[in-house]
Amino acid sequence: GATQLHPERFDFVEFLETVAGRLLIDTPDADFDLQYELPEHPVYVNTDKSRMEQVLDNLIVNAKRNVNPGGVLKLSLKESEDMLDFSVFNQGPPIPQENLSKIWTKFYRDKNSKYSGSGLGLAIVAQILSMQHLIYGVENQPGGVAFYFSIPTVK
């Protein structure tokens, strides 16, 4: 069922580049400035690869939908102690304070969103990350919004 996780060890840096490439490089008409801030070496994690792909898919597509025309979309991976911190930042309008906590619920959709959709994407992200007891969140930053999570690294 939905609760089965099948962890495997893999390089998260290469994995992110592959997933992001599939989602972002193939959009020649895309009007944004894609930036990466990634380690120059492999960083291994032990997690369910297909679930993590769903997480990245949803977070990256969400950022792509909300980035201002010509704005920055930035993917970052930072190592700290035994953790790898992922974030995706998009320049764009802030999320109203009262909506920040609601954004992870099943049918939340920003009424200002230009896109129709089920609103399930972020709920799926929350479910998968919670199942693995990973810390995740969203915050307004100067000029935009960042979604983030942290995952333990393995040797």
Task: For the regions a language model picked out, list residue spans one by one.
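Conserved micro-motifs of the catalytic ATP-binding
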Residues: G1-L5, Y44-T47
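Short conserved segment of the HATPase_c
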Residues: I95-F107
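Conserved polar catalytic motif of the HATPase_c/GHKL fold
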Residues: D57-N58, N62
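Conserved catalytic submotifs in the C-terminal HATPase_c
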Residues: H6-R9, P28, D33-V43
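A conserved beta-strand-to-alpha-helix junction within the catalytic ATP-binding
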Residues: H6-L24
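Short alpha-helical Gxxx[C/S/T] motif in the catalytic ATP-binding
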Residues: G121, V125
